[in-house]
Regions:
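Bacterial N-terminal signal peptides
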Residues: 4-16
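Histidine-/acidic-rich catalytic cores in large beta-rich domains
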Residues: 20-313
Length: 313
């Protein structure tokens, strides 16, 4: 895909290929820039942009990303122009209410699913901004900043929701009933304030339903990734210090590749740790990492692989 955003001629040195694995081309945000990073680690294109918690690429090559606290926009990549937008802070009956959007998803029918924190609901809208469906969310500790993190509509029409403030992943059916939920354990440790490796909690960020029916969960400030069965048994875990020379901090995005590997976001981890890590789950071998702190800072919370088809995320 050819982009005509500002061309960045500087080449990053902050990337690594471990063993024989190739690097990845991906989109990300950090240091007030939305950027595409090449497989060689160079910034191919960039544009000024604030923080994000979610990003998608549409079949037409456009990007869908959040702008500000509550607006979702579609960006035409040839010139970086916004060609469509929906503002949950002003539309859908939300004007005057505290609203934050941390997750959304383009749907196969052309509509968009949006998780609205504050109102505590999932909405599906058409491209005219008309609400087609509303799913109320169960939130034990409501707050517009923490009601949700990543939310995904599954192939069966259910919704898999990370409730950051509750420390719980809930699955809702198409009628809004909770059909499964999993409380992220504290593993016998006390909560600790902060965002980096020294913090601790259960503020889940992402959940991916695997082909085997299990759920892969990034536990945010729990510094780990866990695989949980429908019966709520943990059958696999990647802990904070399992990867040699790498410390996991606020574990964010999860991308499950067709080859079975996991690409994991490692936010707030400091300059001594990579911001993205690709891991073989069976061996816990690191096959690729991106050390993006110098270029994108300590708050690179979301990324999107652009060079691999069929990724679950």
């Amino acid at each position: 895909m050819r982009l005509s955003w500002t061309i960045a001629f500087g080449v990053l040195t902050a990337w690594a290929v471990v063993g024989q694995a190739a690097g990845h081309r991906f989109a990300t945000q950090g240091e007030n820039r939305l950027a595409i990073v090449g497989a060689d680690g160079s910034v191919e294109r960039e544009m000024p942009w604030g923080g994000i918690h979610d990003i998608h690429r549409l079949p037409n090559g456009h990007f869908m990303v959040q702008r500000g606290t509550a607006e979702i926009v579609e960006i035409e990549p040839e010139n970086g122009q916004v060609v469509w937008s929906y503002d949950s802070g002003k539309q859908g009956g939300n004007e005057g209410r505290p609203v934050e959007v941390h997750s959304f998803q383009p749907l196969p029918d052309g509509g968009v699913m949006i998780a609205e924190s504050g109102p505590g609901r999932i909405i599906e809208i058409d491209r005219d901004g008309k609400i087609q469906k509303t799913i109320p969310l169960k939130v034990a500790h409501p707050h517009p900043h923490t009601d949700t993190r990543l939310v995904r509509k599954l192939d069966d029409g259910h919704y898999l929701v990370c409730h950051e403030g509750d420390g719980t992943v809930r699955e809702y059916d198409g009628a809004g009933n909770v059909v499964w939920e999993y409380d992220i354990p504290m593993f016998g440790k006390p909560a600790a304030e902060g965002h980096g490796p020294e913090a601790f909690g259960n503020k889940c960020f992402a959940a991916v339903r695997l082909e085997n029916g299990n759920t892969l969960i990034s536990t945010g400030n729990g510094h780990r990734v866990i695989e949980v069965t429908p019966a709520k048994e943990i059958v696999w875990t990647l802990e904070q210090n399992d990867l040699p020379g790498i410390t996991l901090a606020w574990v964010t995005t999860l991308e499950v590749l067709p080859n079975g590997n996991y690409v994991i976001g490692n936010c707030h981890a400091g300059p001594e740790n990579p911001t993205l890590v690709e891991v073989e789950p069976k061996t816990k071998k690191v096959v690729w990492q991106f050390d993006g702190h110098a270029e994108f800072g300590n708050s690179m919370s979301n990324s999107l692989l652009l060079d691999v088809a069929g990724v679950r995320r």
